[in-house]
């Protein structure tokens, strides 16, 4: 098996097991103060380091507490991953906050605001598909 495929397979297994541990294995109350989604798992080629990117749905204070709880649980998580995946040496786990979903929601909110402003000015009729209207003038 190519080294890249093994790294991908280990990353997928780490994602699955970490998800299970977040739901049922970690007892730290800080971790359960928000909705956590694992967005990406990056494992180094030598399988010694693992970055787990998470999105946390909570207020800023709750998000900070969740991240503190995850960092505190990382050594427990490393041990559990080593045991569950039967790895001789489990990778060192570091959690990173992924703000991609947050930024996406912000962009969608801004686009919604822009559409409402355009409707108020009468530039586009309510409920119309602006993209479709742009192509109506083109010849077939």
From Swiss-Prot:
It is found in: Cytoplasm. GO terms for cellular component: cytosol. Residues 116-140 are annotated as: Disordered. The keyword Metal-binding does not apply. Disulfide bonds: none annotated. Pfam families: RBFA. It comes from the Bacteria. SUPFAM superfamilies: Ribosome-binding factor A, RbfA. One of its GO terms (molecular function) is ribosomal small subunit binding. GO terms for biological process: maturation of SSU-rRNA. PROSITE patterns: RBFA. Keywords: Cytoplasm, Ribosome biogenesis. Monomer. Binds 30S ribosomal subunits, but not 50S ribosomal subunits or 70S ribosomes. Belongs to the RbfA family. NCBIfam families: rbfA. HAMAP family: RbfA. One of several proteins that assist in the late maturation steps of the functional core of the 30S ribosomal subunit. Associates with free 30S ribosomal subunits (but not with 30S subunits that are part of 70S ribosomes or polysomes). Required for efficient processing of 16S rRNA. May interact with the 5'-terminal helix region of 16S rRNA. This is Ribosome-binding factor A. It comes from Synechococcus sp. (strain WH7803). The lineage of its organism: Bacteria, Bacillati, Cyanobacteriota, Cyanophyceae, Synechococcales. The gene is rbfA.
